[in-house]
Swiss-Prot record:
It comes from Salmo trutta. Sequence repeats lie at residues 64-85, 87-107, 108-118, 119-140, 141-162, 163-184, 185-206, 207-228, 229-239, 240-262. It is found in: Secreted. GO terms for biological process: acylglycerol homeostasis; cholesterol efflux; cholesterol metabolic process; lipoprotein metabolic process; phospholipid efflux. Residues 32-63 are annotated as: 3 X approximate tandem repeats. Pfam families: Apolipoprotein (PF01442). This is Apolipoprotein A-I.
Length: 262
């Protein structure tokens, strides 16, 4: 039992210094000690609960011994931890220094590797370019073959479609003529209907046109009768100007008469 407590205490002290790479080992060691003591308290509590489950009649004496052993274990772990604290701290400092030295060596190795690899970047690029060129040379014939196949297929499709297109073009002309033939009767029917309606309108308007023409002839005759004497009266007074005015009036009259007769 004492050996177990001592081993746990030493393991606790060593593990405390193995994790960090900084110089804050004593403070972290204290945290681990506290955690270890809490863990021992939990172990004792769990063991005590298990002991309490035993029958008091049959295992009473055994339960007392186990409880005492748990108390002794916790007390011994605490005492041992306190007595080994100086050694643990010294060991932790040594471990921290060793870890720092290892870290420095690792960083130095990494830097050395980087320095050695730097000149090889050009070589690596050359190798990669070579591989890519090899892939391109292998793939290029396949790609050309696929492109040529597609071109051949498209040409074959065009050859097949050309007669169909020509046939459709010829059918379009035929269809236009058929459509025209179907539309002509409809157009003629509409034209006949319009002509019929125009004749009906002319028949209805004819009496009104004749009446209007008679009224116009009557009005022109009245104007002529009134203008005739005036021209005779003014003929001697105005001379050639009056004669010209008369001629213009007569021409106007004749124009109106011709328009009404049309």
């Amino acid at each position: 039992m004492k050996f177990l407590a001592l081993a746990l205490t030493i393991l606790l002290a060593a593990a405390t210094q193995a994790v960090p790479m900084q110089a804050d080992a004593p403070s972290q060691l204290e945290h681990v000690k506290v955690a270890m003591m809490e863990y021992m308290a939990q172990v004792k509590e769990t063991g005590q609960r298990s002991i309490d489950l035993l029958d008091d009649t049959e295992f009473k004496e055994y339960k007392v011994q186990l409880s005492q052993s748990l108390d002794n274990l916790q007390q011994y772990a605490q005492t041992t931890s306190q007595s080994l604290a100086p050694y643990s701290e010294a060991f932790g400092a040594q471990l921290t220094d060793a870890a720092a030295a290892v870290r420095a060596e690792v960083m130095k190795d990494v830097e050395d590797v980087r320095t050695q690899l730097e000149p090889k970047r050009a070589e690596l690029k050359e190798v990669l370019d070579k591989h890519i060129d090899e892939y391109r040379k292998k793939l290029e014939p396949l790609i050309k073959e696929i492109v040529e196949q597609r071109r051949t297929e498209l040409e074959a499709f065009r050859v097949k479609m050309e007669p169909v297109v020509e046939e459709m073009r010829a059918k379009v002309s035929t269809n236009v003529e058929e459509t025209k033939a179907k539309l002509m009767p409809i157009v003629e029917t509409v034209r006949a209907k319009l002509t019929e309606r125009l004749e009906e309108l002319r028949t209805l308007a004819a009496p009104y046109a004749e009446e209007y023409k008679e009224q116009m002839f009557k009005a022109v005759g009245e104007v002529r009768e009134k203008v005739g004497p005036l021209t005779n009266d003014f003929k001697g007074q105005v001379g050639p100007a009056a004669e010209q005015a008369k001629e213009k009036l007569m021409d106007f009259y004749e124009t109106i008469s011709q328009a009404m007769k049309a």
